[in-house]
């Protein structure tokens, strides 16, 4: 396992690394459903959250070119639901914004804000996400120097190019960058394949807590653990 003395920048995944994403999305689906009950009642009645999720899977299967763009999939899902039930499909953009706003009402893990503060005091931090969350909208923008999203980059992790783009945003070579994330495949394997250091954020109560870490990767319980390992 490589040591971290050469690290000058840190890239971080967002969903399930800085906050649990499932409860956030479930709550956002409920907010969207409530909005639809007021503005598009036929759609709300005909497409409750479980059916909306099924429709979303249908749209994703029909549009593989959007695999890296969750916003495009969500918007088309809402538009299709409105059209199927005779409501105005032009409402889709407004409905999406309602969902997107609620999607950013995240509950940060307790270590995130103090951990980011310690890391940002020494390193440039770059967000790298396959999702559509934005660090400014979740109130963490002050800690980050930039972000690279799969939606804007055009491909998702674990593709090496998105990690290289994050390194460029940080102004550092891959061997100078530590990537932190919860997913062994997209975050850890992806970072290692792109030449970065990889830090697996494996929270004790997380879904992957019993999994074996990858060879060559560092294992951390949270961001404060990362800061301690880096001597800050």
Where in this protein do the model-derived segments appear?
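N-terminal helical cap/lid subdomain that shapes the substrate entry/recognition surface
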Residues: 3-110
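Asp-based, Mg2+/Mn2+-dependent phosphohydrolase catalytic module
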Residues: 1-10, 22-23, 87, 113-117, ...
């Amino acid at each position: 396992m490589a040591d971290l003395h050469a690290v000058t920048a840190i890239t971080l995944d967002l969903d399930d690394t800085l906050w649990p994403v499932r409860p956030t999305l479930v709550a956002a689906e409920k907010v969207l459903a409530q909005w639809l009950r007021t503005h598009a009642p036929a759609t709300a009645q005909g497409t409750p959250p479980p059916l909306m999720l099924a429709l979303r899977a249908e749209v994703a299967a029909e549009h593989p070119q959007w695999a890296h763009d969750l916003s495009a999939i969500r918007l088309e899902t809402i538009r299709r639901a409105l059209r199927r039930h005779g409501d105005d499909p032009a409402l889709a953009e407004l409905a999406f914004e309602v969902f997107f706003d609620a999607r950013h009402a995240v509950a940060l893990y307790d270590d995130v804000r103090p951990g980011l503060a310690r890391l940002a005091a020494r390193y440039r931090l770059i967000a790298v996400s396959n999702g559509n969350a934005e660090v400014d909208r979740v109130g963490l923008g002050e800690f980050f120097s930039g972000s690279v999203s799969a939606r804007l980059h055009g491909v998702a992790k674990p593709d090496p190019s998105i990690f290289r783009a994050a390194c460029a945003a940080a102004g550092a070579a891959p061997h100078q960058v530590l990537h932190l994330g919860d997913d062994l495949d997209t975050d850890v394997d992806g970072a290692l394949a792109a030449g970065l250091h990889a830090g697996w954020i494996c929270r004790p109560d997380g879904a992957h807590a019993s999994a074996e870490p990858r060879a060559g990767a560092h294992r951390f319980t949270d961001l404060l653990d990362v800061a301690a390992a880096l001597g800050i």
